[in-house]
Amino acid sequence: MDVAGAGGGGAADGNIQGVPTHNGEYTQYNIFGNLFEVSRKYVPPIRPIGRGAYGIVCSAVNSETGEEVAIKKIGNAFDNRIDAKRTLREIKLLRHMDHENIVAIRDIIRPPTRENFNDVYIVYELMDTDLHQIIRSNQPLTEDHCQYFLYQLLRGLKYIHSAKVLHRDLKPSNLLLNANCDLKICDFGLARTTSETDFMTEYVVTRWYRAPELLLNCSEYTAAIDVWSVGCIFMELLNREPLFPGRDYVQQLRLITELIGSPEDHDLGFLRSDNARRYIRQLPRFARQPLDRKFPNMGPAAIDLVEHMLRFDPARRITVEEALAHPYLATLHDINDEPICHSPFEFDFEQPSFTEEHIKELIMMEAIAFNPGNVGDMMS
């Protein structure tokens, strides 16, 4: 589960005992066989609340502020340059962003010693669950819930896009929720600035939410890729099942064209590659299905908004600002309460020559920025 703090699960009483280390400055916990070593200010109840390819997420309490937080441990974070860069990206981006609908980073736990710095612990604000869990649950969702979740997702995305950043991995498990129905976007490890749209490797983005231009290897993609993902997420929210659950690339494109219709030649202007155009033209042809017939539970305004999000040609897809101003969101939209980011985010640490050691140094500096005291002890 790829979340920075979704609640539930694990040792429910949080009664995990810690062992003091490094002269009592840190405490080590054993969580399902995972060693979790955090600064002593983070105290029980410690509960495992999520795990993924990167490691494990636990909730804890910051004894200095009384706030419950989510701590993500990324084990052996510097073994692989790509993953190390992803961690640095997430930290840098979340420190740059400040928005109600984007998860806040609270701390990078400073490693006790420089030479044994292998695991990164990122501390986030704690949320209760994520949209994936809610969609899969039996919890009833009203149209008002769905509308409010969509509004907050677009509101956060407006801020992200205004910072000249594409999220690139929007999916239900990356949208955190609390009991108030507040929604926060998380997991920025795959984000890119609009000027560095390198092609994404297969393992990267979840295929089901991937826009046609990415499925077709288009290298010059835009913020419209995130809008496509939002359309897929919104439909999944309303219908409680994925819209395009493709098993592979070929089936993914087929599911898309079966629903929204095969693209016409004028929809393919974004494709620079003749091979991609030829590939599209030789696929079986499908007529567009009327969404109101296929999804009779959806009202006309919701259908209209989704149809504008799920357009094959990214240039004809609705923008986030236009979506916020759509009649479907009229009761929530307030342009004066939809802030933008005033300084574009710069990935100025992206030199190809950066080694794992360079990245380790940069993450160390981030940890020191959060915890400036006693830096000399750590350096020695």
UniProtKB/Swiss-Prot annotation:
Q: Which UniProt keywords apply?
A: ATP-binding, Immunity, Innate immunity, Kinase, Magnesium, Nucleotide-binding, Phosphoprotein, Plant defense, Serine/threonine-protein kinase, Transferase
Where, per the database record, does this protein carry Phosphotyrosine? Y203
- SUPFAM superfamilies from the xrefs? Protein kinase-like (PK-like)
CDD domains reported in the protein's UniProt record: STKc_TEY_MAPK
Protein kinase domain span? 43-329
Q: List-wise, which residues carry Phosphothreonine?
A: T201
Which Gene3D superfamilies has this protein been placed in? Phosphorylase Kinase, domain 1, Transferase(Phosphotransferase) domain 1
Give induction info. Up-regulated only marginally in response to chitosan.
Q: Which PROSITE patterns match?
A: MAPK, PROTEIN_KINASE_ATP, PROTEIN_KINASE_DOM, PROTEIN_KINASE_ST
PTM annotation, UniProt:
Dually phosphorylated on Thr-201 and Tyr-203, which activates the enzyme. Phosphorylated in response to pathogen-associated molecular pattern (PAMP) chitin and to a lot lesser extent in response to necrotrophic fungus B.cinerea spores. Not phosphorylated in response to osmotic stress.
Which cofactors does this gene product need?
Mg(2+)
Q: Name one GO biological process term.
A: intracellular signal transduction
Record keyword ATP-binding present: yes
A GO CC term? nucleus
Which Pfam families would you find in this protein's record? Pkinase
ATP-binding in keyword set? yes
Active site annotation, chain numbering:
D169 (proton acceptor)
Q: What is known of its domains?
A: The TXY motif contains the threonine and tyrosine residues whose phosphorylation activates the MAP kinases.
Q: What does this protein do?
A: The CERK1, MEKK1a/b, MKK1a/b/c and MPK4a/b proteins are involved in pathogen defense. The pathway induces rapid growth inhibition, cell wall depositions and accumulation of defense-related transcripts. This protein may act redundantly with MPK4a in innate immunity triggered by pathogen-associated molecular patterns (PAMPs). May also be involved in resistance to necrotrophic fungi B.cinerea.
Similarity remark: Belongs to the protein kinase superfamily. CMGC Ser/Thr protein kinase family. MAP kinase subfamily.
* Name by which UniProt lists this protein: Mitogen-activated protein kinase 4b
